[in-house]
């Protein structure tokens, strides 16, 4: 479904609808015109939040608890500010409700990704060409994909690394790739659950599936983990080409230092 859900009632953003009417029924992304909460960016930085987790998010009753400004919960903030909505409600083994959350629609996905990207690069004009990454995945051109990602990290201002403690965490680099791909409108699954573990990032396209694992400073071999745990088995019945991609980041160079890939062969 598309839009918001509050315990059974579906709705769209009313202010978005008013803007749509006032602009003579012109279809466009109106999310930024409803406000850009910069405090979300600061909360992400402060808590080292792994953004791909937003696609498989489950919370308990704290979601509906009162808003405590002295104890900000990132998931609750996203829910109350409209960046997350209830997908469905389940009952835990203890009998209490559990809420599965989702990002409401593509407009919100792109808006959330864009505010993070703009903050990261500081200048929208230096953001690497999105077309290169988009085309590389559509054309299954892994060399171009690698080069585009490398260029993307190279374009991040140095101060954003030196003044950011998150740069020492694997989640920092994975989150950048996640928001960048999401801003392009791809179907992204973060922390994709399989019977053998969790895939860091899965990109599902019409003609192919990309299974991506991230590592930091060569501590482990990313591609080897994908093959060892047979993450690809989850998608064998989709009759699509499957690409296994292992990416390692170097915290000194602040970029990718190893990019290995294989096309899965039946």
Segments (PLM) and residue ranges:
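A short helix-loop-helix "switch/interaction" segment in the helical subdomain of ASCE P-loop NTPases
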Residues: 1-12
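Short, internal active-site loops enriched in acidic
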Residues: 6, 249-254
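Extended alpha-helical interface modules used as scaffolds for assembling large macromolecular complexes
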Residues: 12-224, 228-230, 241, 254-266
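Short catalytic/binding micro-motifs of nucleotide second-messenger systems
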Residues: 231-235
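Extended hydrophobic secondary-structure segments that form protein cores and membrane-embedded regions
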Residues: 243-248
């Amino acid at each position: 479904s598309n839009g918001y859900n509050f315990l059974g009632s579906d709705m769209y953003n009313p202010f978005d609808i008013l803007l749509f009417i006032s602009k003579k029924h012109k279809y466009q992304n109106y999310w930024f015109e409803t406000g850009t909460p910069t405090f979300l960016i600061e909360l992400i930085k402060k808590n080292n939040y792994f953004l791909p987790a937003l696609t498989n998010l489950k919370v308990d009753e704290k979601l509906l608890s009162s808003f405590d400004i002295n104890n900000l919960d990132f998931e609750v903030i996203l829910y109350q500010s409209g960046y997350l909505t209830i997908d469905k409600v389940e009952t835990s083994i203890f009998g209490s409700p559990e809420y599965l959350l989702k990002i409401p629609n593509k407009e919100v996905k792109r808006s959330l990704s864009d505010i993070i990207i703009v903050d990261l690069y500081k200048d929208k004009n230096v953001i690497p060409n999105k077309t290169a990454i988009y085309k590389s995945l559509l054309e299954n051109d892994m060399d171009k994909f690698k080069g585009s990602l490398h260029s993307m990290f190279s374009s991040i201002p140095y101060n954003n690394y030196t003044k950011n403690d998150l740069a020492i965490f694997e989640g920092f680099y994975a989150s950048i790739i996640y928001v960048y791909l999401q801003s392009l409108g791809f179907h992204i699954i973060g922390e994709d659950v399989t019977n053998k573990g969790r895939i860091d990032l899965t990109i599902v396209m019409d003609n192919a599936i990309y299974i991506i694992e991230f590592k930091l400073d060569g501590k482990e071999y990313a591609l080897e983990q994908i093959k060892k745990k047979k993450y690809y088995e989850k998608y064998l019945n989709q009759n699509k080409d499957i690409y296994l991609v292992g990416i390692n980041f170097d915290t000194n160079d602040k970029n990718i230092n190893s990019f290995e890939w294989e096309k899965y062969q039946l």
